[in-house]
UniProtKB/Swiss-Prot annotation:
It comes from Saccharopolyspora erythraea (strain ATCC 11635 / DSM 40517 / JCM 4748 / NBRC 13426 / NCIMB 8594 / NRRL 2338). This is Type III pantothenate kinase. HAMAP family: Pantothen_kinase_3. Homodimer. It is found in: Cytoplasm.
Amino acid sequence: MLLAIDVGNTNIVLGLYADEPAEGADPVLVRDWRMRTEPRMTADELALTVRGLLGSYADRITGISALSTVPSLLRELRVMLGRYWTDVPRVVVEPGVRTGVPLLVDNPKEVGADRVINTLAAHHLHATNCVVVDFGTSTNIDAISAKGEFLGGAFAPGIEISLDALASRAAQLRKVELVRPRSVIGKNTVECLQSGILYGFAGQVDGLVRRIVAELESTHGGPTTVIGTGGLAPLVVTESDTISHHVPDLTLLGLRLVYDRNFGS
């Protein structure tokens, strides 16, 4: 089985894929787990958590594909893989690793591994231009050509970051649960915050996506498929007018695909 590991700033996501999909079929995600990222976690602590979640699957791993957007955990991730899965073929996505994704930006080394992997997965799923909206610590909106080229994108503060900042800077406001309010017009402080965060972010995303799609199609033609992913995507996607597909495991799929590119399938 293949273990996919996505170490992000807020969460670490694990995915377990079946060994060999049927010819022409997409890889089958058997299980997935999500846990809070601890930036000071050591390789041994990371391994203890990962192996604990995997349970009996831990000794059935035949391949590993991983990435980390947290520099302090990238080294610990490498150490963990070398120490606990010594003989298992593995790929850690970083500059120099073969992904097959052309990075048509000013400085390709600045592009995060998660954005590259999402590009690979989006192009695998759709033979059109794509825009990927990844709702994580930041909200990343990336443009991809129908040829699978990464063209760049836009960053915006993530939902939780914005909510934390608002609660810390406004004396009478506090952090609230991120759920859909009864109506857009809030009847109390909690609902007003929930409405502003949820519908405000949906509007922000739709505005950026429309501009990106217009620019993308003016230079690369159309059509364009818009994909939502990331931990907070389920909350916003249903309120978005532009996101047509919700793919929760987009990054995990990309990790599976990049493993196959480097080790064959």
